[in-house]
Amino acid sequence: MVVTQRFGQGHRILVTGGAGFVPSHLVDALIARGCTVVAVDNFVTGSKENVAHLIEHPRFTLVEADVSEGLPQHEPAIAERFDAILHLASPASPTDFASLPIEILRVGSIATLHLLDRAVADGARFVMASTSEAYGDPKEHPQQETYWGNVNPVGIRSVYDEAKRFSEAATMAYHRFHGLDAGIVRIFNTYGPRMRPDDGRAIPTFITQALRGEPITVHGTGTQTRSICYVDDLVRGILLLLDSTETGPINCGTEHEVTMTELAELIVSLTGSGSSVAYVNRTADDPEMRRPDLTLARERLGYAPTVTPTEGLRRTIEHFSHRLG
C-alpha cells in the first residue's frame, strides 16, 4: 500500500498539545510539508521551548488554551476553518498519572468531544492519538488491534488508559453517526529529543541518571519488555494515517523489543557512563511486556520504522547532554 500525500501547502491543521514532546515534532513535519499549523497548548506538560524555533514562522501560530474548556473562538487563528485536527493533547507520563489525574480525564473526554464537534462542523479529517496503554497489561503478545486489552479500570494508570479508551469510543461514535473522516493511532513507547528529563519514563530517566553518573533505577526484575520507537518514525506513521482514509485503530511503533535491563545497559554503554544498575520496587500495574503487531500499519499505510535503537538513543543522548549541560 502506498499512501498519497493528502495534506500539504494551503491546508490548515490544528494540533492540540502542540508544544509537547511528540506533537512538536509533528508540527515540524507539517510545517515542512507547507501546511499552516495552529498549535494549542496549556503548557501543563508542554514547553514553549519545543516550538520556539517556529514562533516567527508565517505559517505557525501558537495559542495558549486548555482544550478541555473548548477552543477559544475569539482567536482569529482558531475561528477559521481547519482541514484536519490532530488531537494529541494529554499528560502522558507515569508521574503525570499521579499528579494530574483529573486533567488527564478531562482532556481525554471533554476536550475530545469539543474537538470532534469542531471536526464535524469544519468537515475536517480527525486524527486521535491513542496509546498502547489501551491494551493495559496484555495477555496477548504481540498486541493486535483486535485485542480488547486487560486494563485495571481503577488502578493508578487507569486515568490515562480509560481516558484514551473513551476517546477511541467517542471518535468511532462520531465516525459512525456523523460520517466523520476519522483515524485512530495507538502509539507505543516513543522516545527522542524534547522529552522531559523528569517525566518518569524509562529512557529519559536512564539517560539522565547515566549522564550524571548515578545508579540506573530499574523497576522490578528488569525482565519487563518494551518496543521503543524513535519519534521521527512515529511522526511518519501519524502522517501516513492522516493522509489515508483509514479509520483504525492502527498500531504505530516498532517491533524491536528490549528488556529494561538491556535498555539500561545499552544507555550506560552509549553514554560511556560508570553507572551501575539498581533494582527497585516495581510500580503498580506496570505491563510485563509490550510490542505492537504492525501488520495492519504495513499493509494499510506502508509504514516501516527505520531508526535503530542504537542510532535513536545516540541522538536522544546528544540532546540530553546539551540540555543538562
Question: Predicted segment positions?
Answer:
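Gly/Ser/Thr-rich beta-alpha loop segments that engage phosphate groups in nucleotides
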Residues: 19-22, 48, 110, 138, ...
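Conserved terminal C-lobe alpha helix of the protein kinase catalytic domain
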Residues: 200-204, 235
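Short, surface-exposed alpha-helical segments at coil->helix boundaries
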Residues: 48-51, 168, 204, 261, ...
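C-terminal substrate-binding subdomain of Rossmann-fold SDR/epimerase-dehydratase oxidoreductases
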Residues: 6-7, 13, 24-32, 65-66, ...
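N-terminal Rossmann-like NAD(P)+-binding domain of SDR-like oxidoreductases, especially those catalyzing
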Residues: 1-190, 232, 307, 319
